[in-house]
């Protein structure tokens, strides 16, 4: 992700989340946060999705993933997440963690299809609604048969 991608990224972010990240938050991640990495996915002309993460030691924490609303249900989120997990495996990352709203069943289904499992709950995590966050993790060292984990 580059600063010149941010207008499109912010459009996707605002269309995807009730608590969108700001331009400043994305700029911090791509310019100053030494543990952050962010990618964009493009079609021929535009950004169609993105993913941001933090990498610390042998763990990855996925902080943000979204796909342009009109491009959803085409496997783009699956491609983004799969690419990150493949990269993590190659670099011998042990654990991938993320938070998700319990009400976000589409995202949960995607994560579960890659071998993520619920390991905890953060009470009142989403301040806009007070909804909890489910903490999901994927232990890349103990992948289960039939998953990409």
Where are the model-predicted features located?
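Conserved glycine-rich acetyl-CoA-binding loop
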Residues: 64, 68-82, 89-91, 95, ...
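Acetyl-CoA-dependent GNAT
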Residues: 3-70, 81-91, 120, 139-149
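Accessory recognition modules or surfaces
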Residues: 78, 131-140
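Short secondary-structure capping/turn micro-motifs that flank functional sites
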Residues: 29-30, 104-105, 127-128
